[in-house]
Amino acid sequence: MTFNEAYGYIIKILESYIEQNINDDSLISILSDIDCDVWNDKEPNDPATFDDLRTQLEKYKNEKDLYSENEILLGLRDFLILYKENYGYNLDNCINYISRK
C-alpha cells in the first residue's frame, strides 16, 4: 500500500476500535488530530501529530516506499506507544487491540 492507502487503513482500524470502545477519549482525540477530512484543504487538524504518525510508519516501508498490512500495524502500534509514553495518553487497550490483529 502507498502511504495514502496505509493512512486510510489506519483510519478504518481506529474507527472500528472506537465503535467498540466509545468512551476511549484518548484515541478519539488522536483520531481527531490526524483526520484529514474535516477541512476543505484535506490537511490534518494537527499536522505535528500527523507527522508523528508518518514518521513511525516510515520506519517500516519497503524499498519501493510501500507498506504491507503488518508493517502498517507495527507503525501504528509504535505511534500509539509514543503518544502513551511521551504525552500520557491512556492507550493500553488500543495498543493491545492493534497487537492482536
Enumerate the predicted regions with their spans:
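Short, low-complexity cationic-aromatic patches
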Residues: M1-E5, S68-E69
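N-terminal interaction modules that seed assembly of large macromolecular complexes
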Residues: N21-P47
